[in-house]
Amino acid sequence: MKFLFDLFPIILFFAAFKLWGIFTATAVAIAATLAQVAWVAFRHRKVDTMLWVSLGVIVVFGGATLVLHDEKFIQWKPTVLYWLFAVGLVAARYAFGKNLIEKMMGKQLTLPEPVWDKLNLAWAAFFAALGVTNLYVVRNFTESQWVNFKLFGTTGAIIVFVILQSLWLAKYLKGE
């Protein structure tokens, strides 16, 4: 259910794009992300840092898209967000000694420290690669193809990555 909730702004962006175009879709994505943060704050009294970062990036890049009437800003937004996540994971681990993946998943999984480190680096590399892939699609495909990639390609890549990660982690979870 959380996965669908996380996709909420992307799905609305996709639908609005198909109906009204990139600028309305951008406004819808900003509003949907604001609503998402408000709902989480109301329901849980605490909003995860990743969601705050997502809100900040969509407001800045979406706002620039709307104010300057230039779709390139919203197209760059996923790359900037993914790269911020990648840098955040690496910086938290090596500059501050905190493994954010372990912090997010540590209550559900018991893993040796080196495995947590590999998992953290794998997610950082994955986010970095998603950012590069987004740029490639922005530069080499149409706006409509980019929107399709944003929903289906990125979501598919995340699902495949999580499945592969689960298969890799299975050998460490035999006793659980």
Curated annotation (Swiss-Prot):
Its main location: membrane. Keywords: Cell inner membrane, Cell membrane, Membrane, Transmembrane, Transmembrane helix. The keyword Cytoplasm does not apply. It is found in: Cell inner membrane. Plays a role in cell envelope biogenesis, maintenance of cell envelope integrity and membrane homeostasis. PANTHER family: INNER MEMBRANE-SPANNING PROTEIN YCIB (PTHR36917:SF1), INTRACELLULAR SEPTATION PROTEIN A-RELATED (PTHR36917). This is Inner membrane-spanning protein YciB. It comes from Burkholderia thailandensis (strain ATCC 700388 / DSM 13276 / CCUG 48851 / CIP 106301 / E264).
